[in-house]
């Protein structure tokens, strides 16, 4: 973050009202770090995000007595167990699918979580997920919408397993133009159409595999598309706070946010190491080394930079594999310039390989 951006964030923070008691006016309670909260207006939220400040909007937690919990215990495999199955599934992943789906997502004026086109894009995505499930003929697979306290909804596809242990790959579906959130052009090709279509292609890969379906996965698999990430991880909080209250056994969550920009230097993934689960991160490295053709390096993105933070905050082990090291991220996001012309679909396909390997290896793991 530049010095000018830091000064802007400090100025905005100075006018925010700290504390759990709701002030007068239309204010939102945000968390900038563990236990560090401030009241801000919606306009201040947008300006803080534009200045590089990340946060979780926790307004809906007022009165719930939220308490952070220890992570759900998990036992991740130390070795690759299903290389033949995963390799055969990877061979059927399609760069053309990624291109077609991302082009369609980018054609909406924006996918802002409070706009009409944000709802229309979610409906379109829901139809694509339903189509994948219907065409697979997979028994028990389903998709459902999870409503939020705003217009756009979350989408969750489920492949039930023989245990209640759950493995998740997720991406946020919304986009934003920081200059004009509601009406501005925000194709959001990289942020985060790229992650959304990667998760969709991973779902195709899993459900399209006869070997996978015949193997009867041990653990339940879920594919998530979150609404309202750009407003402070809103949709993913809806999901993971509910999972926490329901006592769900989420053993692993892989976040795919930014998956199409190759960067300016050496092509490599960025493994987010802050506010993530270190044991799961090691498993992710093993998956990348086995199933992808590019290396992975450690990087940090700050508190609440994306939806894995909602899982982590609610006690669920989470990791994020990003398109590059954080400092080499796409400079065109959050604007009308976030278009497919800046993206590399071979790089995006590598993300799909990782997502597919992650879900298959953990889906088949026993005693997770």
Swiss-Prot record:
It comes from the Eukaryota. Zn(2+) 1 binds at residues 172, 191, 257. Monomer. It is found in: Secreted. This is Probable leucine aminopeptidase ARB_03492. It comes from Arthroderma benhamiae (strain ATCC MYA-4681 / CBS 112371). The keyword Ribosomal protein does not apply. One of its GO terms (molecular function) is metalloexopeptidase activity. PANTHER family: AMINOPEPTIDASE YDR415C-RELATED, METALLOPEPTIDASE M28 FAMILY MEMBER. GO terms for cellular component: extracellular region. Residues 1-18 form the signal peptide. Its cofactor is Zn(2+).
């Amino acid at each position: 973050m530049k010095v000018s951006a830091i000064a802007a964030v400090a100025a905005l923070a100075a006018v925010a009202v700290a504390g759990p008691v709701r002030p007068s006016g239309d204010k939102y309670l945000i968390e900038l770090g563990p236990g560090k909260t401030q009241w801000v207006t919606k306009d201040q939220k947008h300006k803080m995000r534009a200045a590089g400040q990340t946060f979780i909007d926790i307004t809906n937690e007022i009165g719930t007595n939220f308490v952070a919990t220890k992570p759900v215990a998990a036992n991740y495999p130390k070795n690759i167990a299903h290389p033949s199955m995963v390799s055969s599934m990877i061979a059927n992943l399609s760069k053309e699918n990624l291109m077609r789906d991302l082009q369609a997502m980018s054609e909406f004026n924006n996918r802002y979580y409070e706009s009409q086109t944000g709802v229309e894009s979610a409906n379109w995505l829901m139809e694509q997920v339903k189509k994948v499930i219907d065409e697979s003929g997979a028994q028990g697979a389903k998709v459902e919408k999870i409503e939020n306290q705003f217009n756009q909804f979350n989408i969750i596809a489920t492949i039930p397993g023989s245990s209640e242990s759950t493995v998740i790959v997720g991406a946020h579906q919304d986009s934003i133009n920081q200059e004009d959130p509601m009406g501005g052009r925000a194709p959001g090709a990289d942020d985060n159409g790229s992650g959304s279509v990667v998760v969709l292609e991973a779902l195709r890969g899993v459900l399209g595999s006869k070997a996978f379906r015949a193997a009867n996965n041990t653990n339940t698999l879920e594919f998530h598309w979150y609404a309202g990430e750009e407003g402070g991880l809103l949709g993913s909080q809806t999901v993971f706070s509910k999972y926490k209250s329901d006592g769900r056994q989420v053993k692993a969550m892989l976040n795919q946010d930014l998956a199409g920009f190759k960067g300016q230097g050496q092509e490599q993934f960025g493994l987010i190491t802050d506010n993530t689960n270190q044991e799961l991160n090691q498993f992710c490295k093993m998956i990348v080394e086995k199933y992808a053709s590019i290396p992975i390096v450690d990087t940090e993105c700050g508190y609440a930079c994306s939806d894995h933070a909602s899982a982590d905050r609610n006690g669920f082990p989470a990791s994020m594999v990003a398109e590059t090291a954080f400092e080499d991220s796409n400079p065109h996001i959050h604007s009308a310039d976030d278009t497919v012309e800046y993206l590399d679909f071979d790089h995006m396909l590598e993300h799909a390989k990782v997502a597919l390997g992650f879900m298959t290896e953990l889906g088949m793991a026993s005693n997770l």
